[in-house]
């Protein structure tokens, strides 16, 4: 079975939100079941309730999948909080969301970058594809720079954060941000010829999330 579950190394990656969300949520609940198996059924039931109550937030097809994914975190958070307390619950949710597909995401990204004639252009293409097909209208993007050497895209509105805030759990937004480390860590500037920088995020208190790809100086 391929470790590249998202198909990143194929060279013509297009997000499949239905597949990708299913993979993430299967890994999320399976991980939680290891230590909190007695609560998983209740988490899933609460997840369905939250989806029904938040359908009005769906603005397009990507938002439908992003809503489902984000509300899984809220459901788990609500069920774990009474027994674990806030810091431990946030950490448990983070680990369950970030780690199950972490290595597969890193390895898939690394394989794509290593195989690409131009790793910078390859990852910029993935970013642009995800902006359109995986994020959609629930996010607002600004692109102050997009040329042969730099692709700087700033997220000015984050659907994940909006959903979490609407459901009383904005403190979970950094969990969503943390998943990106899985692909960010695959970038090796000396090896791939470019660097990536994200100095802050909306979830960490920033006004926006800067995703900045920059080629190395010659």
Predicted regions and their residues:
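N-terminal, charged low-complexity regulatory/assembly segments
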Residues: 2-80
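Short coil/loop linkers at secondary-structure junctions
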Residues: 35-39, 86-87, 170, 190
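Short secondary-structure junctions
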Residues: 133-137, 187-194
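Amphipathic interaction/junction segments at domain boundaries or subunit interfaces
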Residues: 79-173
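Activation/maturation switch segments at domain boundaries
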Residues: 1-29, 190, 194-202, 206-218
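Short terminal or interdomain "cap/linker" segment that borders an active site or interface and mediates
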Residues: 142-167, 172-175, 181-184, 191-218
